Amino acid sequence: QRPAFYVWRDGTGNNVEAIGHGGGDRLAVTGVITNWDSKRVDTAGAFDLSNGRYYIPVSGLYMLIGAGVYRWASGNGILEASFYVNGSNVGPRGISYSRGNTTSEHHTVTITFMRFMNAGDYVQMGVPVAQSACDLYYGDNLGYFSGYLLG
């Protein structure tokens, strides 16, 4: 069966469901999301919920997809989302760029990325840039991280 995964965060009983600024409990201001808590798909059994990593089981070309909700309250609300391979951001900045200008602004952020990876590599989703009072909310099934082997 072709390697594929899809994880999300239910977050029942735990309000740490965002990364960035914005007040309240946050996983971190920037960095990788390590607290996904639910799997919908994991055909190779290679996603580790304890650290938010998908360990590449077979070398090949992979498609990665991730989503969350950008929330902005005030200030210079710039947020970038990205993927990380073996702990490093896949680019010099994020794959997406969001900037708020309306109080209580919310919109969906979706990122995609295609890359050849070797067996044993690991991938994560995260936020390399979060300024002012904004965050990427991924709890309550409003965000997800997924991927699959193209070939």
Where are these regions (language model features)?
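Extracellular beta-strand-rich recognition modules
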Residues: 60-70, 108-112, 121-128
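Glycine-rich strand-loop-strand elements at beta-sheet edges
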Residues: 85, 89-119
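Beta-strand signatures of extracellular beta-sandwich domains
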Residues: 80-84, 124
